[in-house]
Every structure is written in C-alpha cells, then in structure tokens.
Amino acid sequence: MTNLEKIYYVNAGPGGTFQKSGDYYTTPADVDNLFKHLEDHDIERLLVYFHGGLVNEASGMEAAEVMRTNFVDAPSKTHAVTFVWETGLWEIIVENLSAKSSDNQFQKVLNYVIKIVGKKLGVGARGGGVTLDNPTIEAEKLKVYPFAQLNNQLGNSRSGSVMFDEDDEEGFLARLEQESNTMIRAEDEMATEEIEVAEPDPDAGDSRGLLLTLGKLVAKIAFAVLKRYAQETHHDFYPTIVEETFRKIYIDRVGKWGWSEMKEKAQKMFDDNQGRSGDDLHAGTYFLSLLEKHYQKRQNAGKKFAIELVGHSAGSIAICNMLAATSENFKQLKYNNVVFLAPACRTDLFIAKGIPAKQNGVYKKFKMFTMKEENEKKDYCVKYLYTYSLLYLVSGLFEDETDAKIMGLHEQFKAKKRYENFAELKTINSFIMSNKLALSDDITNTDNSMWTDSFRHGDFDNNPATLKSILSTINIV
C-alpha cells in the first residue's frame, strides 16, 4: 500500500461521495485538513489532477504519487492534489474481451464477416473483390496490425464505392443472409448453428441473449459494418469488424455498462450536497465549496493563488462537470489552465460545458496533449484483437452510437475528409486550434511547454516529456 499523505489526494467513493470502497478513503475532515495545509504553507499554486476513470485504486494512488513527485514544490509554493475516483473496470473489460475473442464461435463469426465485408468493399487478398481465404485471414490476425495493407487500399472509402443498398436495407440484409448461408455451407459448416447474441436491452435485467443462426448473425454484423462504411462512420477494416462483432455477441455489455457507470460517477462527484452530511456528501462539490472560500480569502488578502486543472482520458469528463458546477454554483472561482491529456470526453459534452466556461472567464487558458492519428492507430488496446487505442474503442463500442465523437481523437477533431461536414467537429476544431494543441511525438518544438512523446494512451500522465511540458505550462501565468 502507498503511504501517501491525505493532503495529496481526495478519494471519491460510490456515487462520487466520501463513502469508503477500498483500502484508501477520504473524509470531509481530510479535505478540511488539506485546505488548512494550503493556508499554513502559504500555497500560491494548486494543481488539481483527475486520472482516467477505468483504473483501479492502486493505479489511482500511483497517479497521485506521480503528481506529488513532479509538481509539489515548496520553494515555488506549489501543491498538487489528485482526485482518486477509480472504478477498477479496465481489467474486467480487457479480461472479458480477451476471453470472448478466444472462443471458437467468436473466431468463426469474425472470419466469415471478414470474408463478406472484404468482398463487398471490393478488396481481397490481392484486391478486386476476391474473397479472403482462411490462411490469409489467420495470418493477418497474428500480426500486431492486422489488415494494414488492406486499410491502405481502402483509405477513407467514400460512400459511393461501398456496396450497400440504402434504399432497400431490409432486402440488402436478406441478400447478405443468403450469401452468408451459402458461404458457410460451402465450408461444411452448419449455417443453422445457433449463437447467443446481445440483442436484449442490457438494463432489462435479463442476462440471456437471443439466439441467432450463424448465417443470420454473420449477415447482421456484415450489414452493420458495411452501413458504417457507407455512412463514413467506420474505424477502418478490422477494428470496425471487431467492434460490430462485439456489439452483437454479448460482450459489449461489460464495456458499455462500465463506461456508463464511470461517466455517472464523474457527474455525481459534483452533484448538490443539500440535505447531505458526513460521508454521504459528494466529494467534488465539498472540495469546490472549500476551494471557493480559500480562493476568495486569498484574493481579499491580495495574495497569489492560481488553480490548474489537469485531466487524463476520462478525467476530462470529470473536469467538464467540475467546470459546469463552478459556473453554476461557485461563481467566485477562477482557474488558470485547463490541460487535457488524451481526453476521452465526448465533443458534445465539452461544447456544452467546457467552451462556455472559458467564454465566461471561468478559466483562462486551454491546452490539449494527444496522439497524432497514425500513432493513435498503432496503440492497440488488446494485442491481436482490438488494434487501435482506447479512444477508438470508446467511440466505436462503449458509447450508444457508433463512431461517437471523442475530443482527443485527432482523426475526428481535424474535421477533414470524411469528418469535414460535422458541425460539432468544426466547433471543437476551432476551439482547439485557437488555443494550444500538442501532438505526440513532438520534442523539438521551440516552446518546451508543447513537448510530448507518449505513444500509448495510458502513458500521458507519466511520460517525462509531457510532465515537463505541464510544469512549464503552469509556470506561465
């Protein structure tokens, strides 16, 4: 166990409250002591950090230790506090994804979908709409970046080049099912074999899925993939097929449920505390109430006090809610920098809560560190299975709609090519480009507050170049 003093972290438990849920916990009295420490040591700068939302408690505490080590500095009167708000679901999600993917039925379905989709997109082993054979598929799946050459052939396929009948979707699906059945029988498989799928509402309380025949299931998944290509909402060939296969075969419940629970906790941390007391208080709101009092006291005394907000991955969601709560209920508070590291918040959330906060003077400056598109597509979540980054997985599987717009995805916020006609992406692009954007890898910029060379989504909050950049950023007032 980490022996980190409680002045360096605030642990948000179930429902975003102070209720204990693990080995580490925070009480309202601990937060009182934190602000007493700030006053007693005449702290002039406070960095508030939010780690990603799917990590476990131990990882959250490790992040708090990294922040303490890198940003707490007595000579400059700088203190750092980390919100440890773990859900611990990432290991569960990866374990379930990996377990399901090793299932023979899953692999069988995946291979048939690859064959049908590849043929419909007009490519094959050598291009020209040839059906990919089993040895080619299996060889590709053993690569770190499966079907990379095929992706290069497809590029950002325009809808006109995709074989998809938007005028008769029902008929197109029926024809796909016929084609699936024919292909399956040709390989001496049973097209009528039944497979459990995730058709029922995950919130309905019925853990059993529907049973679909192999042929019908393959057709439904191929239909979903081809529709995403036609509507230009795909995440390239193999990741899209994997996403849609998981959406149909049961396992996406784990990811969507975990992600939804995490977002709910990020919201509840800053819910109203009226009528609550003790450990039932919402940790974020209680923290803000004391932060506002401390900020006003420093202001009235003519003393310096700058507040810096830094959020990694889903920590950006918590910060969006913190900014909204500040705007509505703690209007005397003003922040200096808001720094996002590979943010996993939806663009519409930031447009609704983050942009207005800056326009209204709640914070002065914004900076985002994230990966270039080509690096994002080399950061595999699950090796040999989901070969793009966590942000793509969130966009393609964890949100309700496919290709949900996520703020840290370079391919999306560039608002170019197939993303050029999305109004929300134009809005987010305009905001990002009018502020500061650091893309990995960049360690040659003349401005050393823009350096980053993180090539993994999870590394931004412990990447030396990025940490030094944040330090340079918050020291520029």
What are these regions (language model features)?
Residues 309-315, 319:
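Gly/Ala-rich beta-loop-alpha elbow adjacent to hydrolase catalytic centers
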Residues 62-78:
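Short amphipathic alpha-helix adjacent to the substrate-entry channel of hydrolases
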Residues 22-38:
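A short loop-to-beta-strand scaffold at the N-terminal edge of the catalytic core in hydrolase folds
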Residues 54-60:
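Short substrate-entry loop that stabilizes the transition state in hydrolases
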